[in-house]
Swiss-Prot record:
It is an enzyme of class 3 (hydrolase). Gene3D superfamilies: MazG-like (1.10.287.1080). This is Phosphoribosyl-ATP pyrophosphatase. InterPro entries: HisE, PRib-ATP_PPHydrolase-like. Pfam families: PRA-PH (PF01503). Belongs to the PRA-PH family. Keywords: Amino-acid biosynthesis, ATP-binding, Cytoplasm, Histidine biosynthesis, Hydrolase, Nucleotide-binding. It catalyses: 1-(5-phospho-beta-D-ribosyl)-ATP + H2O = 1-(5-phospho-beta-D-ribosyl)-5'-AMP + diphosphate + H(+). It comes from the Bacteria.
Length: 111
């Protein structure tokens, strides 16, 4: 796992026990999962808008910024649910080299 993700995961874990007024992340944990999910949704929409703007203008600065926000809030969500970023990286590694169509078909319930 990248050093940045490792360090960020450690900070997110530390903030779970911090006072809500001590950091933004601690305040999110204090507000609960619904607030965290709201932020993930908000950042998803902002990322989509930034992608459309980048496609039209060729300027990807906002796209990178909003994607970082989306990833960050997704990591907060995972942490709130007791999951580590490595679990997502492991899943991506598992999928590497698999046909996307075959992987999706394997998840479909039989009719």
């Amino acid at each position: 796992m990248s050093d940045t993700l490792t360090r960020l995961a450690a900070v997110l874990e530390e903030r779970k026990n911090a006072a809500p007024d001590s950091s933004y992340v601690a305040s999110l944990y204090h507000k609960g999962l619904n607030k965290i999910l709201e932020k993930v949704g908000e950042e998803s929409v902002e990322t989509i808008i930034a992608a459309k703007d980048a496609a039209a203008s060729g300027d990807c600065q906002d796209l990178i910024y909003e994607t970082a926000d989306l990833w960050f809030h997704s990591l907060v969500m995972l942490s709130a649910l007791g999951q580590h970023p490595q679990a997502v990286l492991d899943e991506l590694e598992r999928r590497f080299g698999l046909s996307g169509h075959a992987e999706k078909a394997a998840r479909q319930p039989s009719a």
